[in-house]
């Protein structure tokens, strides 16, 4: 079983406008290095989820429950109900679509207003960095991420650029916050669940890279 040997389960969501490539990012990550580029998938209807087990540098093995949310306004009432049970959020925009970038603050505010900023690890993700028709600069995105107190990374599911790194960065940050007591287990909160106890996993001291992709 995928959860065998996993100490925790982390719920992580991808949020952003429709068409920014959230589903492609998730499928690329779950498929791993064996995955191949695929045609643009159909838009997500409501919420779908994937899972993957991950061995962290500190020695801890965790199960990731990865939630793919619809970006269309007609599904927002459905997806909002899931926000309070997320511990990690990738806020995704399309570097070739300025409007999707301008909506990031609204997506961020929706999560914060649901459960506050303390329980959630955020990462701003500029997707489709392989395309040469960008209308959002890396500098502008970095400035927005800094103003919201999160890291920034550029990715491309098509070229498999920084896809693993984006998810692994969020996961390691969650694990570190958990070990430091900044995130606490709560039986009424599904963001982090204890699957079985492990013998004192040491906290990771490795700093997370948040460099941009040279696509």
UniProtKB/Swiss-Prot annotation:
TM segment ranges: none
Principal EC category: hydrolase
Membrane topology recorded in Swiss-Prot or TrEMBL: Lipid-anchor
Compartments where located: Membrane
Family matches, as InterPro entries: P-loop_NTPase, Rab_GTPases_membrane_traffic, Small_GTP-bd, Small_GTPase
Binding site for GTP: 19, 21-23, 44, 71, 128, 130, 157-158
Binding positions (Mg(2+)): 23, 44, 68
Domain of life: Eukaryota
Covalent lipidation (S-geranylgeranyl cysteine), chain numbering: 213, 215
Catalytic activity: GTP + H2O = GDP + phosphate + H(+)
Keyword tRNA-binding: no
Record keyword 4Fe-4S present: no
Cofactor(s) listed in the protein's UniProt record: Mg(2+)
Modulation of this protein's activity: Regulated by guanine nucleotide exchange factors (GEFs) which promote the exchange of bound GDP for free GTP. Regulated by GTPase activating proteins (GAPs) which increase the GTP hydrolysis activity. Inhibited by GDP dissociation inhibitors (GDIs).
Family: Belongs to the small GTPase superfamily. Rab family.
NCBIfam families per record: small_GTP (TIGR00231)
Entry comment, domain topic: Switch I, switch II and the interswitch regions are characteristic of Rab GTPases and mediate the interactions with Rab downstream effectors. The switch regions undergo conformational changes upon nucleotide binding which drive interaction with specific sets of effector proteins, with most effectors only binding to GTP-bound Rab.
Entry function: The small GTPases Rab are key regulators of intracellular membrane trafficking, from the formation of transport vesicles to their fusion with membranes. Rabs cycle between an inactive GDP-bound form and an active GTP-bound form that is able to recruit to membranes different sets of downstream effectors directly responsible for vesicle formation, movement, tethering and fusion. The physiological function of RAB42 remains undefined.
UniProt-recorded name of the protein: Ras-related protein Rab-42
Organism: Mus musculus
